[in-house]
Amino acid sequence: MAILETRDLKYSYPDGTVALNGINFKAEKGEMIAILGPNGAGKSTTFLHFNGILKPSNGSVILKGEAIKYDNKSLLNVRKTVGIVFQNPDDQLFAPTVEQDVAFGPMNLGLSKEEIEKRVKDSLKAVSMEGFERKPPHHLSGGQKKRIAIAGILAMNPEIIVLDEPTSGLDPMGASQIMKLLYELNRQGITIIISTHDVDLVPIYANKVYLLNEGKIIKGGTPREIFSDSETVRSANLRLPRVAHLIELLDKEDKLGIKMGYTIGEARNNIKEFIKGE
C-alpha cells in the first residue's frame, strides 16, 4: 500500500485557470521521489495538496490508505504525518530565534516542555545546526535557513517530508549539502519528495521520478527510464543531465558507441569500459 497517492487530482484557481489536470501520483514508504518539471508546471500546487493546504477541485489525496478529510482535526493529523518545506525559507521562519521556530510545531501538539526541548535538540542535531538556538533566523545564510526550516518539520516527527525546490537560491556547495542531508534522512526511513528542475541532481539522489508539465504527469519511472526518453524530457522544456548529453553527442556526432550514463560516476565507468574495449 502506498503511503501517499493522488487519484485524478484536479485543481483550478478561483479565476478558472486549470493548474492541475488529473494528477495520479504514488509514493511508497521509504522512497526518495523527484517531481521534475519546468517553472509553472504545477509542482508547487501539487505539493500544497499533499498535506491539505489546498483542497482538490476534483479527485482525492490518499494518505496511508485513507482519503484526506478537510476538517481541522483531520488536517492536524495529516500535518503530523506530512511536513512541507517551502521553496523560500523566509515564508516558513517567523519566530525571533531558531529555537522558538523549531519548537513552534511541537508546542501546537500540546507536548510537554521536556518533550519539546528534546525534539528541538534532536532536530537541530539532525541538520547540523546545534549552537544556533539563540540566533535570529533572518541573520542566517540561505543554506542555514533551509536547514532550520527542515528542522522545524523534523520536530513534528513526520513520516513524509515534501520539499519545494530545496536547492533553489543556494550555491553549488550549499545545494550539495542539502541534498546529502535529505539523502541521510531518507536512509533513516523518512519518505522524501522533492520538486526540482535541476536535472543533474535527480539521477544522483532519486529512485523514482515523475515528469510534470502543464498540470499533467507525462511520464513516471526510474531516473534511467525518464532520461532515456530524451524526446519527452525536452518536450517539457527540460534537458538531459550534462554528462548524459555529452555521451549522447559522443554517440550521435562522433559515433563512439559509449554506453549511456546519467551520473558522473556511471559515465566514468562506461567511458573506462569503452577505452579498455578498443
Swiss-Prot record:
It is an enzyme of class 7 (translocase). SUPFAM superfamilies: P-loop containing nucleoside triphosphate hydrolases. It comes from the Archaea. Its main location: membrane. Keywords: ATP-binding, Cell membrane, Membrane, Nucleotide-binding, Translocase, Transport. GO terms for biological process: cobalt ion transport. The lineage of its organism: Archaea, Methanobacteriati, Methanobacteriota, Methanomada group, Methanococci. Pfam families: ABC_tran (PF00005). The keyword Cell membrane applies. Its EC number is 7.-.-.-. GO terms for cellular component: ATP-binding cassette (ABC) transporter complex. ATP binds at G37, P38, N39, G40, A41, G42, K43, S44. It is found in: Cell membrane. Belongs to the ABC transporter superfamily. Energy-coupling factor EcfA family. The keyword Transmembrane helix does not apply. Residues 4-239 form the ABC transporter domain. This is Energy-coupling factor transporter ATP-binding protein EcfA.
